[in-house]
C-alpha cells in the first residue's frame, strides 16, 4: 500500500515528511525553459480542456482536478513539440495522426514503462493507486495502457520486470 500523501500548493508531502515536486510543476518549468507561456486558468468559449496557439498554452479554468490539469498540460506540450498547424477541427487523417503523436508524447512523459514499474515498486497494485502515484487520471492511464498494449502486445520486458497489459495491468519481477 503506498504511503499516504497530501498536497500543499504545488508540492506533495508524504506522511513520513518526504516532499516531492509534482509533475505539474515540472511541466510548468519545462514550458518556461522552452519559452512556452502557460495560462493556467483560461476562460474558453469552447469545451476544450486545453488549447495551444504558437507558444501559448491555455488550460481551461473549469478543470478542477489537479491530475486532469497535469494530463492536459502534458498533451498540450506534446502538441507544441510534435504538431504543426491548426488541427482543432480534426478534419484530416494528418490531423488525427498529429493528435495521436501529441498524446503519445504525453503518455511517455507522464507514465512510460519506467513509471509503471516505479508504481509497482512503491506498492501500487490497482489502476486507482497507479494513477494516483503517477499523478494522472485513471482515464489517461487506461488510454496509455491501451496504446502500450497496441505497441508492445500482451507484455513487454524492461530490465528485470515483465509488464503485462492483458488481461489487465500487471508487473512481475523476473528472477
Where are the language model's segments positioned?
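Active-site hotspot residues in diverse enzymes, especially metal/ion-binding acidic/histidine motifs
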Residues: 1-72, 77-175
